[in-house]
Amino acid sequence: MSSYTMQLRTYIEMWSQGETGLSTAEKIEKGRPKLFDFNYPIFDESYRTIFETHFIRNFYMREIGFETEGLFKFHLETWLMINMPYFNKLFESELIKYDPLENTRVGVKSNTKNDTDRNDNRDVKQDLTSNGTSSTDAKQNDTSKTTGNEKSSGSGSITDDNFKRDLNADTADDRLQLTTKDGEGVLEYASQIEEHNENKKRDTKTSNTTDTTSNTTGTSTLDSDSKTSNKANTTSNDKLNSQINSVEDYIEDRVGKIGTQSYARLVMDYREALLRIEQRIFNEMQELFMLVY
């Protein structure tokens, strides 16, 4: 009950007095926009509603420290505009300091540079000897059969020309100059001469058929033995000069939770850090209310 001015709840509930059955939280939610109908700086816009609700609940039963609610709202706005930039920095530092889901952050950076010079000299001597023996035994049987048929025919004409002369010679006084049957030579003497000249012509026709069959059987055997012997000597020299330069950059960031502390505990610590800043704000805002209880 108010003794000097008016309680903050009177102003908040004034905006829902025509409605019945509302809870305190519902009444606060209806009156909150009427109380904070001005702008002021805050670190996170999503936190504005939470901060205003906590303010009303913290001073819900307290009497305002000014004659009228209008004067109270004026000084409330002035206080927030002057002091909230400072407290916003505290809120932001807590956000940087506390990630609600991690309790460790480790960063490792390393740079490694290696320069290596390598000289290799290698002498290699190799003797190779190989002996080989090969044997070949081959036998081949060949059989062949040849069958042939040859047939020939021919026709022609044969002419026989026969000349015959019979001479009888006695002693004579006169000489004859006669040629022989072939017209060559001279017969100088004959007592009696008989000549016969015969011409014969006949036609000829021949036909010949020949069948041939031949069988050939052969066997060949090949035996061969060979031996080989190879020797090789090799000598080599290898030289290798190499230079290796390597640079390694290693960057590691480890972020997370280490230890037995649960995620629920981490979130609770984060919220408590914000509430501690709120409590400092509300302690300093006591000057806006009557210092009587």
Curated annotation (Swiss-Prot):
| Biased segments, Polar residues type | 127-160
- Its chief place of residence is virion
UniProt lists compositionally biased (Low complexity) regions at: 206-231
- Start-end of Basic and acidic residues biased regions: 112-126, 193-205
> What compartments host this protein?
Virion
Give a GO cellular-component term: virus tail, tube
Keyword line: Late protein, Viral genome ejection through host cell envelope, Viral penetration into host cytoplasm, Viral short tail ejection system, Viral tail protein, Viral tail tube protein, Virion, Virus entry into host cell
Q: Where is this region: Disordered?
A: 106-166, 192-240
An annotated GO BP = symbiont genome ejection through host cell envelope, short tail mechanism
Family according to the record: Belongs to the phi29likevirus proximal tail tube connector protein family.
* Entry protein name: Proximal tail tube connector protein
The record lists the organism as Bacillus phage phi29
